[in-house]
Every structure is written in C-alpha cells, then in structure tokens.
Amino acid sequence: MKQETGRRIARWSYMAVAAGYLWWNLARMTEFSWTFTIMPYLGDFGIIAAIFSLILGWKKRSPLVWTMTAGLGWMLLMSAIRGENVLAAEWQYLKEGIIAFLVLAPLPGCLAENRFRQFLKGTIAVWTTAITCQAAIGLWAAISGHAVFSMKGTWYIGMNLGDHRLYLNAYVTTAAAKMGMTVLLTAILFALSRTKRAKIACVMAILVQCGALALTDCRTAFVALGVAAGFCVWTLLGAKVHMPSKLNHRLILPMLMAAGIILCYGLLTGLLTLIAPSVAPGPLDNVNLLEFPAHLMTEASAEQEVILDSTPVHRNIDTTDAFNGRWGIWKGAIRLLTAQPELLLTGTSAPLAAGMMNLYTTPGTKYFQHAHNLYLQTLVSWGIPGLLILLAVIAMFLVQTARISKRNQPLWVLMLSLPVIYLLVCELVDCFTMLSTGSPMLYWLCLLMGAVDAQARRMKLQRLPK
C-alpha cells in the first residue's frame, strides 16, 4: 500500500513539474523572440523533471525515452573526454534539447487518453490565441503599409517596404517556421473541438496565420507545410479507405507530398501577390533592426516616394541561390569533416563547432552560429554515433506513426504527427530544435513525439489478451 502511494505521489509530482516546465517555456516564448536565452535555473528545473521521467520511463519501457537517454549519455561522455564544463552556458543550449525530450515525451503516457486530450486542447488553444493575435497585427501592418516594432519585448512585427516581406522576427525563417507549425497545431485544435463555433474560430485563425505566413515569403515553411499536408491526406486515406495493396499505399505518399508542396507554395505565394502592398521603400531600409527603438512607423514620406510596379514580387523557388547562402555553410561543414576525419567519431566541442566550420566556408560567406541543418550540425558536434541516435529516435517515431494510421483512430490522433513531420523537414535547412537553441518548436516537438508513442503503445496493450 505504501509502495503504491509512493508511486502515485512520484507520478503526480512528475506530471506537475513537466506541465509547469512546458507552460513556462511556452509562456516565455509566446512572442516571436529573436533571442532564446535560457535562464540558468531552468536547466536544473528540467533535470529534476528528467529524473522523474526516467523513473517512470523504466516502468513504461518507452524505447524513445531510453534511446534519447543514450544520446544524453554520449554527449556527457564526449564532453568529459574533452574536459568541457557541462555546466557552462554554451553547453546549456545543447543539453536543453535532450532534457526537454526526457521531461515532456513521457508526459502523454502518464495521463489517461481523455485527460491528455483536454490538456492538449487547452495548451494549444492558449498558444493559438496568442500567435493569431500577433499574426493579425502583422497582417494589418503589412496591408496598411505600416511597420510595427517592439524590440523591448524581444519580438518584432513589421513590413520591410523594400522587398514586400513581413518580418515576424529578426530571423525571418525561424518566425515563419513557428507560424507554419501553429497552422498545424490549430488544425489539431479543430479536430479536438466539438462545437461548431470552436471549429469556425479555428478556421478563421488558420486563415489569419496563413496570411501572415504568406507575407514572410519563406519557402522553407511553404515546402514543409506542403509535405505535412500530403502526409495528412495519405494518413487519412490509409485509415479510412481500403488500398489495393501496400505497395500502392506507399507509392502514393511521395505523389501526395509533391502535390501538397505545389499547392501550398502556389497558394501562399499567390496570397502574397494578392495582399502585399506596393509602396515605396521607407525609412526601414538599411536600419539595424536589433538596435531599433520601439515605435509605430507610418507610410513612406513624400520625399521618399518613388514609382514602383503595382505588382508585388517574391523570390522564385528556382533562383540560383535557392538556400540563401546555406550552400557555403554546408560545404564548410563537409570540408571540416574531410580535413579532420576523427571528428566523424567524436565530433567537435559544441561551442567550437561553429567557429571551426566558419574556417572552411566558401570565401564571402558571412559568419554563422550553426550549420543550418540539424542533422549536419549533429554530425559535426557529436559524430556519427550522435547522428545515429537522433535518426533512431526519428525512425521509432515514424514506426509508431505508421502503427497509428493502420487503425481506426480519432482525427486528432491521426494528426498528432503532422507538426513533428513539418519540423523535421524544416530542420533540413536550419537548426530550430533538439541540438540548437530552445525555441517553442522544441517543446511541441518533444510533447507530440511522446503523444504519438504513447498512443501507439496504448493500442498495443489493447490488442493483448486480458
């Protein structure tokens, strides 16, 4: 009896700490922050929750949790061999990703399905409301030809009047990727909602979010959203419609993804052309955004007015520099690994990885802080073993996703994997989560990967004889 009471106390203590950890991080990052400074005590708070999650993970025997634990062990081992201080601020960024996973991934499995449904619904509703309000402000600013800055609050929404792009963040790709993720989270909220009013509100929020996303002209988010849309249709077809054979079911996936990319890219760039203002370049040009004071800018002054083509322009997907200078960064990382092959096994010190890669980049490439590719960054920082651990976690997630899609599940369950797949595609051209900085996408990724894993394990238990 006492042992059962102790387990129950530990379980509820973990859930309280994990929920607080999630809400705290989402609350401090609801704004589109261009700085993701992790507070010193946050790592200690996460470690406490991680210990709880490992204790419960042993009982639940979640392969995802234990594989990621192996990743943390490998990072600690390599850091110890190099003589690094694992409490240093630079290392904190790297361990934040794995700690967040160990804290949040077991949470859905500790809650009953109905309770997790309510927990997820409430969390997404608050997040969607905050982000939709910011998207609405951005749309108003762009369509009216104004620009709104609020750097003091570490977020910024504005319209660069020179190239007709809406900047939701000083780092446009990061902000656009967050907006695309919010579109998919709102779609899950739509599936979770039961009333017609709530569903209508979700649709309206998605329209506002897509409008703001279109004005960012971020091709990464456009393409990743198309991949997620194609995967969504494929999952629904597999769950609701009988396919002639498994081969046909698998072959149709890349076709649907290609169609989704074309559709999303066409719709969003078309929306950009439709609603983007055609105004003269204003005082925003050639301004250091990171030092700009908070204020409200009006239209370009009469002295600066020039005649422009009435049709707004956007970048073509087949431009010669399709990846905005990332080719030079990726080549630098590959040259580093070629010049020092031993790094393929051990990886380089995480704080030194960027500096070492910059030494091998193409001349003229500006300095960068990471490899702009999560998988390449993992390879450089933690070697082939670290990359294999990351790929193993992703493979386990995809297997669990496939198991869910084979059974008749509620719509919201079938859609849980969409934001994760979306983010994994975005990671091909940036480092938003895991071994990069602690952005809101990191916490959603960990929570939803754990939710898919928990749902698949529940299905497995239901099939076992009583």
List each model region and its residues.
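Hydrophobic transmembrane alpha-helices and their immediate junctions
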Residues: 237-239, 243, 381-421
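Long extracytoplasmic/lumenal interhelical loops at the membrane interface
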Residues: 317-382
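A membrane-periplasm/extracellular boundary helix in multi-pass inner-membrane enzymes
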Residues: 236-317, 335-339
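N-terminal signal-anchor transmembrane segment
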Residues: 1-57, 75-83
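Interfacial loop-to-transmembrane-helix boundary motif in multi-pass membrane proteins
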Residues: 11-14, 64-72, 107-140, 198, ...
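Aromatic-anchored transmembrane helix interface
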Residues: 44, 69-74, 86-110, 122, ...
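Transmembrane alpha-helices of multi-pass inner-membrane enzymes
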Residues: 19, 229-232, 412-466
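Alpha-helical transmembrane segments of multi-pass inner-membrane proteins
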Residues: 121-154, 169-241, 396, 400, ...
